[in-house]
């Protein structure tokens, strides 16, 4: 409907760039990359490390953020999250960003936009492992930027502003129905490193202690 598109295009989805709204993307399409495919893999561990498994991935996440303390993921599920496509990557306000469009319903009998409260959106993120998906999208984008912009390895995340999940059935111009996050630098760097080189509990504890 017309109201839906007005709400979508006028939604102010970037907390750190309050003047930005989605309609601006269509005025500058050269800064947009839709359906950006990626493939992350679990590399062979270097000396002194062990292969990153689903349980060690959960341990890594929990070390940085207590929200993950009840996080459970099978090896099959983990492999599924390592390959995919980012719905939209774009440049705005001097940073690079990720958008993921979601169509989840909260109430299958009587779903209304008003149901998409911050608490309900947080529950959708947690229950569907979208928080993990978001972090892996940012690892993938970090790597792409380092290659395409010829940035020194380990610096790509500094150019990223964060990721926004837009739940389309609840979105409005005040950003209801959206979830924004920019995980800690140390978490993204740790995930990137452990995927490439294997897990190290000693390194994890050291990085989590000084995480920013």
Q: How would you name each of these model-derived features?
A:
Residues 1-212:
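Structural signature of nuclease core domains in nucleic-acid processing machines
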